[in-house]
Amino acid sequence: MGISIWQLLIVLGIVILLFGTKKLRNIGSDLGGAIRGFKKSMSDEEEKNAEQQPLEKQNAEQQAQAEDKPKEKQG
């Protein structure tokens, strides 16, 4: 009851007739470029987060040490 291979081939043929192969090639390359750009921005964001996490941990440790020093002076 689903879409058969023949129906898909007919739809593909109609699309090629309407748009032409050159325009479809341009659309495909534009879509590929957009996907590559999206993947690159996602990987850049992950690298940024990976760099930021050690800095946050280091800042938390320094803050904890700074809070411990006044306690030592009081005691």
From Swiss-Prot:
Q: Which organism is it from?
A: Marinobacter nauticus (strain ATCC 700491 / DSM 11845 / VT8) (Marinobacter aquaeolei)
Task: State the UniProt keywords alphabetically.
Answer: Cell inner membrane, Cell membrane, Membrane, Protein transport, Translocation, Transmembrane, Transmembrane helix, Transport
Q: Which residues cross the membrane?
A: 1-21
Localisation: Cell inner membrane
* Listed name of the protein: Sec-independent protein translocase protein TatA
**Family membership noted in the UniProt record:** Belongs to the TatA/E family.
Its membrane topology is listed as:
Single-pass membrane protein
Q: Where is this region: Disordered?
A: 41-75
Read off the InterPro entries from this record.
TatA/B/E, TatA/E
Its lineage opens with: Bacteria, Pseudomonadati, Pseudomonadota, Gammaproteobacteria, Pseudomonadales
